[in-house]
């Protein structure tokens, strides 16, 4: 199911999320302590990461410890389901235990590939000025499913914004070419198109958009065909 687009949380919302996570971690610590002391484990209560005792107390300790480990990972940045699963698979070798951990994380709302993809796209567009094709490749590498990628890219990639980012990169690259060649009169337009076009393609911009933007920038800079 496609979730509505989430706006950037304000300070109050972020503070509430941090308080919630702190509460979850505290409850998990109490849960582990109770199990280690041989006491009856608390029921689910308000914490979806605590599900009573899974199989036995020793296994339950593993489950809640790994849930806490994932919370630590998510404290640094959001992660896709595939990333979380891969991290856990390095630490947990019993399939049913790993699946129980994933189930609890999902119940707690900590697995959200569409939300992860949206945050990833916004961050990478801002920091690296990546185009849609490059972002799609990165999300595929992160294990995000095609429908989630399509949804996020469709709502966050209007043509005008893509063109603006392409123009910024094209101008930066062209400025370097002009400095190296000593001016527009010394710059080979065909060679500049190939070099800058290749750089933009590697950033994920389409050939049609790249040619459109580059030719306009070259015209504006006075770079002619030799």
Language model regions located:
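An alpha-helical, amphipathic repeat domain used for nucleic-acid recognition
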Residues: 1-226
């Amino acid at each position: 199911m496609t979730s509505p687009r989430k706006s950037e949380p304000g300070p109050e919302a972020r503070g509430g999320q941090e308080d919630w996570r702190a509460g979850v971690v505290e409850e998990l610590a109490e849960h582990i302590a109770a199990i280690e002391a041989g006491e009856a484990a608390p029921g689910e209560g308000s914490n979806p990461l605590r599900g009573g005792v899974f199989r036995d107390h020793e296994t339950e300790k593993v489950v809640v410890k790994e849930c806490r480990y994932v919370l630590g990972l998510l404290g640094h940045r959001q992660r896709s389901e595939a990333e979380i699963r891969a991290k856990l698979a390095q630490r947990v070798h019993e399939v049913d235990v790993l699946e129980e951990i994933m189930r609890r994380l999902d119940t707690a709302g900590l697995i959200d590939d569409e939300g992860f993809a949206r945050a990833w796209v916004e961050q990478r567009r801002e920091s690296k000025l990546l185009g849609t094709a490059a972002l799609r490749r990165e999300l595929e590498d992160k294990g995000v499913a095609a429908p989630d990628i399509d949804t996020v890219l469709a709502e966050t990639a209007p043509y005008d914004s893509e063109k603006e980012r392409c123009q910024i990169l094209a101008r930066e690259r062209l400025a370097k070419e002009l400095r190296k060649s000593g001016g527009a009169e010394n710059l080979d337009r065909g060679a500049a198109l190939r070099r800058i076009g290749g750089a933009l393609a590697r950033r994920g911009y389409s050939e049609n958009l790249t040619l459109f933007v580059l030719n306009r920038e070259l015209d504006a800079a006075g770079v002619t065909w030799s």
